[in-house]
Amino acid sequence: MNRYELLKSLKGILNEKLVICNIGLPSQELYKIDDQPNYFYMLGSMGLSSSIGLGLSIAQEKQVISIDGDGSVLMNMNTLTTIGNRAPVNYTLLIIDNGSYGSTGDQNTFTKENTSLKKVAIGAGCKKVIECYGENTADNLKKAFNDKEHSYVIISKIKPGNISVDPIPLNPILIRERFR
C-alpha cells in the first residue's frame, strides 16, 4: 500500500474531523481523493503539521488529526515531546512512514535504517503509540477516535512512491477561510 492508497482508505473516516495535512504530495493526494472544507492543507511548512494540529486541539474541543510524514516528523522531533506531555484527548497524530522524503524525490529517511518513530514517540512521553501497516490504519484510527481518555500517535508503515497529481488550486487565504 502506498500513501495515495492509504489516504483513499481513510476517506469516510476523516469527514467529521479537523484534518491538518502535511505539505506537498500528501496534501495534493488528499485534495484529489476527497476535498473537504475541514481539511487544512499545508502548502509550505515542512515539519509543522503536527504542531499546528496540536495547537488546534488545545484551542477547541473537536477531534483533530494531523497527517504527517516520517521525514517531517524527523525534521521537527521536538513536537513529539510536547504531544507526549500536553496533547488533549481530541488529538491524533498519524505519521505516514514510507521511509522517504516523498515530496522531494524519494530520498531515504532514517526510518529505513535504525530510527524507530514508535520508540522515539514513547521516549518522548506519548502513551498511546501504535505502529501498523497501511491496511490496518483505518481500524486503528477508529480506535483512537473512540477513546475519550487518550491522545494517540499512529505510525502507518507503507511503501514509498508517488502518483502524479495536480497542485492544489486553492491559495492559503482561501484554505484558511473555508477551514474556519
Residue spans for each PLM region:
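Glycine-rich beta-alpha junction loops
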Residues: 23-27, 98-100, 157-162
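Glycine/aspartate-rich loop-and-adjacent alpha/beta segment that forms the canonical ThDP
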Residues: 36, 147-180
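Conserved thiamine diphosphate
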Residues: 108-143
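Active-site diphosphate/adenylate-binding microenvironment
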Residues: 1-46
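Short acidic, glycine/serine/threonine-rich loops at helix termini
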Residues: 31-33, 105-108, 164-169
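Thiamine diphosphate
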Residues: 29-97
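Generic beta-sheet signal
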Residues: 17-19, 62-66, 91, 148-156
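Long, charge-dense
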Residues: 96-107
